[in-house]
C-alpha cells in the first residue's frame, strides 16, 4: 500500500516527530511511504530516516524549499529562478514569477496570540483564494502522481481538503486542541468576535467539488480516522467526541548510542535540559521565535550549581547568545527520549512534542511558551502537576519578549526540588505508557486501510 504523510511546512520538528515513528513502522511492515514537507530541518530528518520527500509543483513550495533549505542568498535565488527545473515545471522564469505573484498567500498580521487552527489558517496565507486553490491543485497532482492509497496528515488543512476531493482515505493525527470539538488553543478565555477566518475561501472551493461546507477549518482535520495524541487526562475532549487516543508518539532512532559526553555528566549535580526548538524562524524577529527561552535561561541559570544541556533541534544558535555560561553545554541535537531520561528537569518552549517527551519519560518541566498553542500545552502539563510555566511579557508588536530572571530562577528551583512535581510526572508517565503507542497506532491504521479496500 502507498501511504503519503503530509504536514504543515513548518521549519521545526514538532509535527514531524509524531509522523515519523508511525511512518517507519508502516515501512517496516512493507508499505511504500513518502513525505511532503519542504522545510530545511524536516527535510534533513526525513532524509536521514530514509524516506522520499515529495515537493508539490507550486511556486511557493519551490521558493520555500530554496529559502528554508538554505540561508537567504540572492545568488542562489537567481540561479534557481533561471534553472532548468523552473523551466521544466513552470515553463520558464517569467511564468514562474507570474504564478508566484498570482498565487501568493494573503496573511493576517503576525501575532503570538493564535486562537485556533481556523485563526492560524487565516494568519498563514489561507485568506487568498488563489493561494488555497493553487496549493490544493498542486497537492492533488502530487497525490495522484504518487498514486497514494491513503493520506496521513498532521496539521495541513489544504492537504486534507485535497485528499477529500480526490476521495483518498484520510487519517489525521492531531492534538486535542486541534479537534473541531475542542475550544481551540486559548481554551481558558472567550475569543473575540472578529477573528480572521478562511472559511469563505474554503467553502467556495469545497462547493465547486460538490463537498459539504464547513464551519471552521478544524473540520478538515477530522479524518475518516482521527487519531488524537496523548491521553484524556492530559488532552481532554468532550465525552461524546468520536476520536481515538493513541498515547505519546515520539521519534528517536532505534539502537542509537548515547553521546560520548553523557559519561562526563556528574550524577551528584542536577541535569537540566533546555530545548528551544527553532530560535528564529525567519531572518527577522517574529512573535513565535524561541530565542527568549535560551536568553532568559542564560541570565537565570548562569550561577546555579546545575549542569545545563542546551539543544536547538538542528537549528543554529544565534550569535548574539554566545558565549554561553561555564555551566552550559551546547549541542545542536540530542536524542530526545534519551536526554529526557537522563535529565532532572526540562526547560522548553511548550511545543507539544516537548511536553509529551517530559510526560512520557516522567521528567518534570518548566515551560516558557512562545505563543498560544504552546501555552495551551503548558497549561495541560501544569494541570496534572508535572511542571510549571512562565509566560514572557511582550511589547505591542509581540516581537520583543522578556522574562524576569529572578522569577524564572525561583520557578526552576521550585520544580527541581519539589518532590510532587517529579512524582506527578512519573504518575502520568505510567498512564501514558499504558495507552496506544506506535505499534498499536499502526495496527489501527492498517485495520482502517483494509476496511476501505473491501
Regions found by a protein language model. Give the residues of each.
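Glycosyltransferase specificity loop/lid
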Residues: 1-156, 160-162, 172-180, 309-342, ...
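Short, basic, glycine/proline-bearing loop/turn elements
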Residues: 5, 121-127, 143, 197-203, ...
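A nucleotide-sugar donor-handling region in carbohydrate enzymes
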Residues: 191-280, 314
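Short, flexible/disordered intra-domain loops and linkers
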Residues: 185-193, 282-290, 396-403
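Conserved nucleotide-diphosphate donor binding/catalytic pocket of glycan-assembly enzymes
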Residues: 170-197
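A short helix->loop->beta-strand "cap" motif at the edges of active sites that frequently abuts
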Residues: 167-169, 223, 363
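Short hydrophobic signal-anchor/transmembrane segments that target glycosyltransferases
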Residues: 288-305
Amino acid at each position: 500500500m502507498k501511504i503519503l504523510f503530509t504536514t504543515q511546512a513548518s521549519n521545526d520538528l514538532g509535527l514531524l516527530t509524531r509522523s515519523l515513528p508511525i511512518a517507519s513502522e508502516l515501512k517496516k511492515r512493507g508499505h511504500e511511504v513518502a513525505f511532503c514537507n519542504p522545510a530545511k530541518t524536516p527535510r534533513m530528518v526525513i532524509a536521514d530516516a530514509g524516506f522520499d520527500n515529495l515537493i508539490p509543483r507550486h511556486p511557493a513550495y519551490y521558493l520555500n524549499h530554496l529559502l528554508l533549505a538554505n540561508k537567504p542568498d540572492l545568488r542562489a535565488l537567481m540561479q534557481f529562478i533561471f534553472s532548468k527545473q523552473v523551466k521544466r515545471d513552470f515553463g520558464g522564469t517569467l511564468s514562474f514569477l507570474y504564478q508566484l505573484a498570482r498565487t501568493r498567500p494573503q496573511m493576517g498580521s503576525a501575532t503570538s496570540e493564535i486562537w485556533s487552527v481556523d485563526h492560524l489558517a487565516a494568519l498563514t496565507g489561507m485568506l487568498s483564494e488563489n493561494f488555497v486553490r493553487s496549493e490544493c491543485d498542486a497537492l492533488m497532482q502530487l497525490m495522484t502522481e504518487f498514486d497514494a492509497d491513503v493520506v496521513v496528515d498532521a496539521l495541513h488543512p489544504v492537504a486534507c481538503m485535497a485528499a477529500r476531493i480526490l476521495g483518498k482515505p484520510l487519517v489525521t493525527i492531531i492534538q486535542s486542541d486541534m479537534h473541531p470539538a475542542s475550544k481551540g488553543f486559548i481554551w481558558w478565555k472567550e475569543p473575540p468576535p472578529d477573528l480572521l477566518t478562511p472559511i469563505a475561501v474554503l467553502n467556495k472551493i469545497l462547493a465547486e467539488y460538490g463537498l459539504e461546507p464547513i464551519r471552521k477549518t478544524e473540520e478538515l482535520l477530522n479524518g475518516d480516522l482521527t487519531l488524537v495524541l496523548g491521553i484524556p487526562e492530559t488532552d481532554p475532549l468532550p465525552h461524546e467526541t468520536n476520536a481515538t487516543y493513541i498515547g505519546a508518539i515520539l521519534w528517536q532512532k532505534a539502537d542509537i548510542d548515547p553521546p560520548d559526553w553523557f559519561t562526563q555528566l556528574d550524577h551528584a549535580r542536577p541535569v537540566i535540559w533546555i530545548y528551544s526548538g527553532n530560535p528564529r524562524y525567519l531572518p527577522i524577529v517574529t512573535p513565535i521565535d524561541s530565542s527568549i527561552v535560551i536568553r532568559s535561561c542564560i541570565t537565570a541559570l548562569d550561577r546555579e550549581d546545575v549542569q545545563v544541556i542546551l539543544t536547538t533541534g538542528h537549528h543554529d544558535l544565534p550569535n548574539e547568545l554566545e558565549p554561553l555560561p561555564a555551566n552550559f553545554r551546547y549541542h545542536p541535537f540530542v536524542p530526545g527520549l534519551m536526554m529526557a531520561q537522563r535529565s532532572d528537569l526540562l526547560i522548553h518552549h511548550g511545543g507539544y512534542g516537548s511536553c509529551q517527551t517530559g510526560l512520557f519519560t516522567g521528567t518534570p518541566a518548566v515551560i516558557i511558551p512562545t505563543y498560544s498553542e504552546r501555552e495551551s500545552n503548558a497549561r495541560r502539563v501544569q494541570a496534572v502537576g508535572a511542571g510549571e510555566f512562565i509566560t514572557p511579557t511582550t511589547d505591542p508588536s509581540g516581537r520583543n519578549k522578556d522574562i524576569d530572571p529572578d522569577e524564572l530562577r525561583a520557578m526552576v528551583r521550585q520544580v527541581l526540588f519539589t518532590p510532587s512535581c517529579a512524582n506527578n510526572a512519573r504518575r502520568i508517565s505510567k498512564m501514558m505508557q499504558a495507552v496506544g503507542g506506535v505499534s498499536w497506532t499502526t495496527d489501527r491504521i492498517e485495520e482502517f486501510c483494509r476496511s476501505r479496500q473491501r
